[in-house]
Each structure stands twice: as C-alpha cells, then as structure tokens.
From Swiss-Prot:
Keywords for the protein's UniProt record, in alphabetical order: DNA damage, DNA repair, DNA replication, Ligase, Magnesium, Manganese, Metal-binding, NAD, Zinc
SUPFAM superfamilies: BRCT domain, DNA ligase/mRNA capping enzyme, catalytic domain, Nucleic acid-binding proteins, RuvA domain 2-like
A Gene Ontology term for the protein's cellular component: cytosol
EC number(s) on file: 6.5.1.2
Protein name stated in the entry: DNA ligase
Domain (BRCT) ranges: 587-664
Listed NCBIfam families: dnlj (TIGR00575), PRK07956.1 (NF005932)
InterPro entries: BRCT_dom, BRCT_dom_sf, DisA/LigA_HHH, DNA_ligase, DNA_ligase_CS, DNAligase_adenylation, DNAligase_N, Hlx-hairpin-Hlx_DNA-bd_motif
GO biological process, alphabetically ordered: DNA repair; DNA replication
Known function: DNA ligase that catalyzes the formation of phosphodiester linkages between 5'-phosphoryl and 3'-hydroxyl groups in double-stranded DNA using NAD as a coenzyme and as the energy source for the reaction. It is essential for DNA replication and repair of damaged DNA.
Amino acid sequence: MDNKLEKMKELVEELNQYAYEYYVLDNPSISDKEYDLKYDELVILEKKTEVTLPYSPTQRVGDKILGEFSKYTHKGRLWSLDKAQNMEQLIEWHNRNLKVIEQYNSMSEDKLPELRYIVTKKFDGLTVNCTYDENGILIKSATRGTGIIGEDITAQIKTIKTVPLKIKNSYVIEVHGEAIMTKTAFEEYNKAAQVPLKNLRNGAAGALRNLDIKETARRNLSAFFYDVGYNEGPEFKSYREMMNFIRNMGLPQDKYIKECTNMEEVEKEIEYIESIRGELDYDIDGAVIVVDDIKTREILGYTIKFPKWAIAYKFEAKEITTKLLDVEWNVGRSGRVTPTALLEPVELGGVTVKRATLNNMDDIKRKNVKLGAKVLVRRSNDVIPEIMGVVEESLEESEEIQAPDRCPYCNSHLVQNGVHYYCENTLSCKPQMVKSIVHFASREAMNIAGFSEKTAEQLFEKLDIKSIADLYKIKKEELLTLEKFKDKKSQNLIDAIQNSKNCDLASFIYALGIPNVGKKTANDLVMKFKTLESIKNTTIEQLVEVPDVGEIVAKSIYDFFEDEKIISNIEELLNLGVKPYYEEERIDENPFMDKTIVVTGSLNNYSRGEIKDKLQSLGAKVSSSVSKNTDYVLVGEKPGSKYEKAIELGVKVINEEEFSNKIK
C-alpha cells in the first residue's frame, strides 16, 4: 500500500508540473499521449487504493452536481477600485498621492521612496479569491461577493486547468485573480451549444455560478492572478515583489506589467493597452494603476470603499443609459417563453439600439429592472445588447414587470420549470412549430434547400402542418396554393424534401431538436452509440460518458427519448422513408494525419470554422496555442503572436497555398 501511495504522490507531482508547463508556460515537455498514460495510471491507482490526494489532477474532472452555494468569509477583504474616466481625473489622483507623501516625508525621518506606479490590464471577468493552506494545497475558492463574504466556488475553480491545486508554499495565503473566458473558448463553446452565450463575461460568471460542475468545465475558463490579499508569511516590500511571488508559485499571471515613474509614462501605457485591446483573446475594460511601494500604500490608506493607492482607468465602454418602455415575451422552439426589453432608441457603439436581452424573471428581479426606469445597457462583442442594471434614482415612478401566465401567441396556460416559463402546446403554438420546422430543415440538420421561416409559416397556417412528419406528406399541388409558389419552386421544394430522406445520423439527431444538443454533441452521440436505436435506449450513466455531456444534457437526451409522442413522431418519419445512416469515417493517408496544427491570421478560402473542420477531416488535431509539440502553424494574412512563437520555437510554418498543395 505504501509503495502505491508513494507512486501516486510522484504521479500527481509530475502531472501537475506537466499541466503547468502546458497551460501556463505554453511549453510542454512531454507529448499528450505520454501525459494520458501517466494520468490513466494515476486513475487506476486511486481506484485500487481508494485514496485521492486533494491536489490530484483527477479532481478537475467536474462530474458532480452541487446542491447549493455556501457562504465563505474572506480572510482578507477584497476591495473595489476607484475609477478614472480620463487623464485629468488620473492626474488629480496622482497629485493627491504626491501631497500625502510630501506631508509624511516632511514630518518623518523614515522617508518614503519616490512615487512609482505599476500598470496592468483590467480584466473583464469575475473576481475570485483562492485560499492555499500551510501545505500549499488549494482548500477554498470564492467569489468577491460583498468583499467580506463571498460564495464558495471551490469545485468550479478546480475545473480551470491553469489554476494549480498545490503550490510550493508553507504558510496560508489568499490570492486574488480574475476568472475569464477567452474568445477562443467562447467560440468553441457556442459551436456546440443549443443556447449560445451572449458575451465572455457572462460566460465566465455563468460557469462559476453553475451547480453542474461538468457544465463549468465545458466552458474551459482561464484565470489571471494579481494580488495577495492575505498572507501569514513574510511581508512584501513592493507590488513587484508580490507579483514575482505569485509567478514563482506557478499561478497564472499576465505578462504585461509595466513600471512608471510619472503620469506621462502612465498615459503612454494606457494608450498602448487600449491599442491592443481588440487583438487580445480575452476582454479587458481598462487599466489598473497601483502604487508599487507597500509602506507608501499603508500611509495612503483606504476610503470606506476603495484603497487610495490604486485606481482603475476605464476605457470608453459599450454601455449607455436609456429608458425601458416595455417587455415583449417571445416563444422559442423548445416552448420557452423569454422576455425582451423594448427600449427608447439610443446610439451605442455606432448602432441604434431598440431592444435588449432580459434572460428570465429571476434576472429581472435580481437586477431590479422595472418598466419606465432608466436602465444600463451593454453591448459586448457585437452581440445582442443586454440590460446590466438599473439607475436607482429612476425607480420612483416605475412599475413592476409581471410574468405572463398565458402564452402570448396561443393563450395556453404556461408552466414554470426552474427560472423559465414554458408553453406546452407543441402542436398548435405557431412560434414553436414554425421554429421547429425551420430548425429541422436547416443546413446542418436535414439540409432541405429553399426552406425559409416565411415558408414554414405558410405551411403551418395554410397547409395545417402540425408535426415534422407532415413535411413528408406535402404534395406539389398543395404548395401551388401558397403565396409566391409557382411550378418550379414547388417542385424544387418537393425534391429537396424527398432528397433529405437519406441523411447522416448525426444530422438527423440534431434535426430532432433535443434540448441542449447542438451539432457537436449530436456528432459525439453518434460516434459513441453508432445507431439511432442505441441512442434512443441509452441510460443517463452511459450518456455522461460522452465527451462534454454532463448530467443536465444527459437528462435532456434521456427525457426526450422517454416521451411517447416524440418516439411516435420518429417512428412515423422512419415509416415515411427517412433513413438516417452512419458510416465509420475513413481518412486517407495525408501529410496532416495525426499532426498538431495551429492556425493564425485570415485565410482566403476558409473561415476559421471551415479550416478547423477541414483539418479535422484530415485527421489533424487543431490546437489554439503554439508549443514545441506543434507540428505546423498555418499562417494567413495579419497573423498574430502565434506566428512569432512558431518562429521562436522553430515550428514549421506554412501558408495557405502550401497547405492546398499538400492536400491535392
């Protein structure tokens, strides 16, 4: 037993070091295959010994659903930062600091040093506090909360691969950081999500406040650490020293840290950060300027809310205040009834905004949003604007938003499930049926060419199409009665419907509209179970073994195929001649098979999604970062830092023309 435990400790130390090299340093020393072999060996030993070390990498898997969030009292307070909107306000802050230091030095023999500032980026994510004990083990992680009391998110933080579960430290510390979702992770998640995320910040916040840990893991969060908020070890003399300590502990840290001795230098760095803002793989909303010397910080002190020795310079945000005129309730394909805010039109980021997202009634109540009130609207990453909060002073003459009790379209009684309201009238509720038909016919589903929402509406209203199976019963002469349907268009649609009967199984599964199942999950299900019959009869336990399928998604799939009406509809589709098929994909030998490839820059003949699909069809592994284990970097126009990293590491670089020649 002792030998096995020693071997486990050895494997855990090795695997954590390899993970640090891979995720933090971006410079792995072993191959993925070697890592997987050691990881599998550790899993076997943990099962045999029934012992799992608290800092074992197997604790990152995230395969449980928690009951609720518990409170955690921070050992050291998490302060908010005062904000400057322009250089004049920043200079005022600087002059106040100078005045306090001059007064102190005039009365004290122990002089404070020349004022020196450290400038860093201000990340637009969710503040987190991680506690490591005297053995260096991560024992607690929590949200900021009030700054004094937060919520325990330890299990969620452990899914972030860059956050070490153990550090080489012998006293209790709390480190503050920002959990973020990168643009790369955001795009990857949305490819497979039935309900796409709206922006990076919500992606991170929603992941950390999700009780389904596997869903948190799916979002592939990252983190940057920038402060030691509580420390039972030797005191730091400067912020530089503190940041070096954080880095030496193996905690992920942004490389950009600049020292400035005057406001001209600070302004130059702020301008630089703003200039690279759009190139970053994550969101920032400003710069943070802090006093470097710790003793000077102590002399400057705090207000009730903020430290006087730090300030955030906020970039011009894509946010604005306007009036909430009304709330419109819309019905989606799943029957979910969701609110949309109707706003007094306002210009935001070069666009006239009239509507904004309100996720559900819980969201409305939490943000205290009311009719007639002034609301703060944010537009991130060019997606649908979202209401972030309300102007408190505008609430006096406002009205409460009432949740509907009937469907706004078919007048059926709504049922509440969790935070959402649903219309269960799937047969005659127009928005549900129309959106279901459009989804079924879409390119990634059954690929019925020439099918639009307008066509679906006519089929529902004039041809009484009440189920997906009814599509395969439509006759040409019926289509000729519809608006703008002549002979050729009618025949083309009939042909397209008939041609769709021979479809691949993954497209059919996706077309069925299973809640929480996107095209990627549909593909993964087919890869795992091979046949429609197997997928229909699988268990929740088997479903969670599918990559990226957690308890919630597994239950959605299981419940879907338990519904007798759905099974009846599927049987009717099969009886009408729909024949989903699955063929094991065979990949011909090619130069990119089993190679790791990174893509950077814009390509002429492929979008980012298309080139990824193409490479994967060639048997290649597509990575988002360059390391010495990368085989090729495919470079397009205006490549980013990945190109420079490839040159630095001596990785083979090819352009689009060379790529095309290699696959001819």
